[in-house]
Amino acid sequence: MVNRFLRALFYWPIRITATCEPIPFEPLKHIKIDPNKQIVYIMVSSSVGNMLTVERLTKQLGWPSPFEDIVIGQKKLPRTAYLRDPTFFGSTGRARDISGTIFQWFAASREINEDLQIIPISVLWSRDPSIEGAAIRGIDLATPVWRKFLTLTFAGRDNCTIISDPCSAFYLEERLKSVGDYILRKIMLNRLVALHFLRKARTIVGRPFPNRSRLLHELVQRQGTQSAIAEAMEKDGKSKEELEKKAYEIFDIMVADTRYPLLRFFNTIISLIWKRIYHGQSIVGANKVRNLVQNGYEIIYIPCHRSHMDYILLLFAIFHEGLPIPQVASGDNLNFFPVGQIIRRCGSYFIRRKMKGDTFYTALFREYLSVLFERGYATEFFIEGGRSRTGRTLPPRTGMVSMTVQAQLRGIERPIAFIPTYLGYEHVMEVGSYMHELEGAAKKKESIKGLFGIFKRLRYYGRGYVTFGEPVIVPRFLNKHVPNWHDYIDPTGNSRPEWLYDTVNQLSHEIMIKLNDSASVNAINLCALAIIGDADHTLSINMLKRCLKLYLLVLSCDERRKGLMPSGSLDTIIAQALELKKFRVYDVGEDMKFVRPSRGQTLQLTYFQNNILHLVALPALIASVIIRNGHISRADVISHTRSLFYFLKHELFTPITEDELDSFINKYINVFVKGGYILDLDHNMLALSGDGYEELLILSNSIRLNLVRYLIAVTLLRQINDGTLTRKDFVTACVDLCKEVPSEVTNNSPEFADPIMFNIMCDTFVRHSYFSYSENGTIIPEHNKIVKLAQAAEPLLAAKLVRHLKTEIEKIKSHNVLGHEAAKAAQAEAAAKRTPEAEAISATDDKRPIISNDSAKTENKTHGAAISEDKIESSAAACEDKMQSVSEFLDDKDAKS
């Protein structure tokens, strides 16, 4: 009766002043509820404010109200058990025997043999961890009435409601039976419940933020800093006082100054902006991070870097999932007024973008990182260094990973866990400027003017995607790769074991693989993959649906993609992609509808295609091998795919290990067979099916430019002699050759000649012994291996293109004797003499088989069961003619509009 009166009295005041933000952010996706079992609740306090907040949330989730009683068999019992009752002045409240109600649930459920779902729920009225040395707020077991009144009045909208996973009543009862004495069971149950709520609250609130002034002085006096100062004194001859002052100034620029009120304010602003420009967000994997935090791991978020919006998206996800708020590494280019001071108070620390050569600065930064790790603060940094202009994951910058491993080698007790975090978008506001930069435009410096320019571009951007991937645990990784790493622990931080460099590179590569493995696939990614894969970038709606169906079949082969792919029908996926206006639908009459990129959007679609290219690279390569043969044995498909996949794997950080490769190749082949795209004939022979040729061709085109780059590199390597080219010269020559490839092949893609791709390729060549370096840094090719690689790559591309590349290489061979500038002049002269015929090179002709003699013999026996190559050629030609006429019609329509 009293509860009903208080509920009626305080319902509207609490409804107005308080929120009920749940943790996890989307409970129904993460909390598994059995609809056939009744629900009961365990709460910290019987406070009316807590009860009304929980009631509001349970109503949204479709769960019963905590105010209602529960009927179990013939018994009517309270649905909610409480740990404490609030008092007016007491800080901890009055203890209640929670075990009494729980034991009643046990007895009643046993009588009718029906299990109950016990859900612990707690309400935090402040998430402010405060500053070191101050009292921690928000974790009290039961807030007194007077403080609750003030909290509701001034900070009621800062609360969060923590929902734990349900526990079976039968299971809990069985666990308690191991304690023989009834009194001990009651004591243990009360303690377990109290400990559970306390751990949950501390996980959400996190550690108190460091006192910046105290931390600055402490950093200067630490042993590592003093050692760096002593080395600098010997090297530069400066006094200790001068260097200590310099160290203090560096730390003053570097160290964060996190303030919770500002974080909370910006979270409110971010939430408002987010709801305006994004149509929701998907957050996956937060439970893994919460479990690591509760088990005492040091958390380091490693997000991919796509946009300046990454900071906002990740902070939104972290805040709303109740994860530890990190200290974020930011480049010193963002430390300008007033942005620098604002983001510093939001948890950013500023570092130079290039530290190489400055041992003093590097030592100081290493010391600051060690302090953060030792004290248990979560951190965040972008392992790619800068934003990706192409949409692909960039090669890792290993500096901070190395410092992290060195911090672990100091002997800190907390194991460090890297959390690869994928951030996905349906639109990136900077994508237009990225395309200009790839074409050669200068990068614009960050400024306050540029910041205001961002607000002008705020519009509908689709959906945001955050995926917390599988963690990479540093001690576990070291145990696997360096079993005796404990022998190198040095509390001074001076440990530089000889295995550090290689191990850090392997660790960084592992992080990138896990990062790409957590990629979310959205509608715009899939549609871009199909549209850009077509030679004319024009598809009928029906063909687009068929391509999407193939992509979804291929992606669903990997169980790790579960929960990371778009749901809904193919029409729904296309409708979601059309919302972004990156391509349009044209009705050409007779119930024929076609899609093609909107004006100026073709290059931007390549960016979103590249976001998921690593997920379809292997099936696309398999499709290429099968298409170029028509008939081929399964064993030959595996062999040819293996020979080229290593380059795709290292360039795209494809998340498939060596042990999994053959299994995945067979899985994708089976999907093609089951979907009717290819035929599985006798004697393990595979052949093209007439129905699925176009979809396979579009899929294979997604990696065509990658194969062209490999062919450029391999063809150049075949022409050079030992010791005539350095790595830098080789990359430059490859880039120059890329610029000579006709636009009909490259689709004017500015990323095609990106030097980063060829630098990654060089690493792969060295890793797999295709070439090595001499003492003076020049390339020494392994010609036998390179010839075999060329023989695998050349048949997958047009013969005219192969001949054209060889001709161009002959023209620039003078580079070796004339030098780079003279070679450029020679290239310019050769380009002026090029005939128009050399430009007209098709990327899809000359389907020369690459099968073995045995496969060819088997082919003759099975020729009648599969589509003939003549039919493939005529089908492809008819398709191209039809699409050409449609493309011309749409061009005319665009011109008129």
Q: Which residues does each predicted region cover?
A:
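Membrane-interfacial terminal anchoring regions of lipid-handling membrane enzymes
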Residues: 1-897
